Amino acid sequence: MTIRHQGQQYRPRMAFLRKIEALVKDMQDPDTGVRVQNQKVKVVSIPHAMTGSDVLQWISQRLWISGLEAQNLGNFIVKYGYIYPLQDPRNLTLKPDSSLYRFQTPYFWPTQQWPAEDVDYAIYLAKRNIKKKGILEEYEKENYNFLNKKINYKWDFVIMQAREQYRAGKERNKVDRCALDCQEKAYWLVHRCPPGANNVLDYGLDRVTNPNEDQKQTVVSVRKEIMYYRQALMRSTVKSSVSLGGIVKYSEQFSSNDAIMSGCLPSNPWITDDTQFWDLNAKLVDIPTKMRVERWAFNFSELIRDPKGRQSFQHFLRKEFSGENLGFWEACEDLKYGDQSKVKEKAEEIYKLFLAPGARRWINIDGKTMDITVKGLKHPHRYVLDAAQTHIYMLMKKDSYARYLKSPIYKEMLAKAIEPQGTTRKSSSLPFMRRHLRSSPSPVILRQLEEEAKAREAATTVDITQVMSKLDRRSQLRKEPPPK
């Protein structure tokens, strides 16, 4: 059986029809398919008819599924018009009894995508009106009158086509005429379903373009493709064993911190109605949990991503007289993700504070990066300081981060960290005894608390005499000659 698919790939949520069609093809196999035979329906012997029970039995045996699953799948096949009932056409369900069904011809399958237009439906209704001598169902009469008003300018063409099709149908033998009428009726029951029925083919608006369509190649597109393949050749290839080993190592390291896989302590607030978890893991809590502090040692990004970890790291950098590095990194993050209407003002402020000669919090970056940054500041945008930010980030990662993990500040934080104990869920069968679930802390409030903490840190004065005495002591040690 040769079946053409016309544009099915761009229809959303309809890819499963291909699988149904593959199953229907197997059902029509003369050797291993469903048993079919001639059946008499209303004095007419219909060829290739089958019973609903035979279809369900074949589906169960073919797919190794239960009777309930086979019934559900059979209903889908009937609703989408691949099998249609002969005795009760409007009942689009598969009955598990001796009710007769027949396979729909592939021309009327949904994936053929010839549009069910108003003109075709009007011709079908006009043909039925001629055949039944005006005796149509109520919803068909309404549709007939509506289409008569809608396409009145071509109604003569509709009537002429209906008469021609009716005349051609009368020339066929009785069996073929009855089979074609059943197929056509089943098609329109699916595509123009009666009132109250579920329209299974309603998938929304068509896409303007087909994403799978071959686009015309231009000089620009070919150049982009060549550039892409050249870059792909330059990439270093990694063995799959190395990649999989990295994934396994990462999973083992982070499994204890996964709230879904390992649970969360003291308890899940959405289940137990206990907000202690949110209180212990607030952004700038005084004493963090042990699991949170241990996570800072996984990698530098985990430390700098956590507001509390960043606060502790800033305290360490200030003792090493390099707190301006983290301050510059935070200012660059605010430039990228903050209010974009103030990009120019923020960029100028960052330059005066960190990059200008003699700046109050001057940072040490190489000359090449400084030249790139200064040139970019002539036309500032949110990513103008990326080169300098990356340089400072790598400097902190390779130099300061390792010393921080060995410092007394981190060890003291780890020693004081809280290790919460798990709590049991308290529930009550009486609704009035249950506490109302609370929502998580508001991000606005947490942001305000974080900004207030930053303001307090910025307001703290530095004892300049203490700093100068340390610098003098260092210079004095350098000048003293080593003992002989």
UniProtKB/Swiss-Prot annotation:
- Tissue note: Photoreceptor outer segments.
Main location group: membrane
Instruction: State the UniProt keywords alphabetically.
Output: Membrane, Phosphoprotein, Sensory transduction, Signal transduction inhibitor, Vision
Quote the Gene3D superfamilies the UniProt record gives: 1.10.1240.60, Regulator of G-protein Signalling 4, domain 2 (1.10.167.10), Transducin (heterotrimeric G protein), gamma chain (4.10.260.10), Winged helix-like DNA-binding domain superfamily/Winged helix DNA-binding domain (1.10.10.10)
Q: Where is this region: Disordered?
A: 460-484
Q: Name one GO biological process term.
A: regulation of G protein-coupled receptor signaling pathway
Bias (Basic and acidic residues) occurs at: 470-484
User: In what way is this protein post-translationally modified?
Assistant: Phosphorylation is decreased by light exposition.
Q: Which GO terms of the cellular component aspect does the record hold?
A: cytoplasm; neuron projection; photoreceptor disc membrane; plasma membrane
Residue span, G protein gamma domain? 219-280
- DEP domain location is 30-105
Q: What does this protein do?
A: Inhibits signal transduction by increasing the GTPase activity of G protein alpha subunits thereby driving them into their inactive GDP-bound form. Binds to GNAT1. Involved in phototransduction; key element in the recovery phase of visual transduction.
Q: How does it assemble?
A: Heterodimer with GNB5. Interacts with RGS7BP, leading to regulate the subcellular location of the heterodimer formed with GNB5. Component of the RGS9-1-Gbeta5 complex composed of RGS9 (RGS9-1), Gbeta5 (GNB5) and RGS9BP. Interacts with PDE6G and GNAT1.
Put simply, this protein is called Regulator of G-protein signaling 9
**Whose protein is this, by species?**
Bos taurus (Bovine)
Q: Which gene encodes it?
A: RGS9
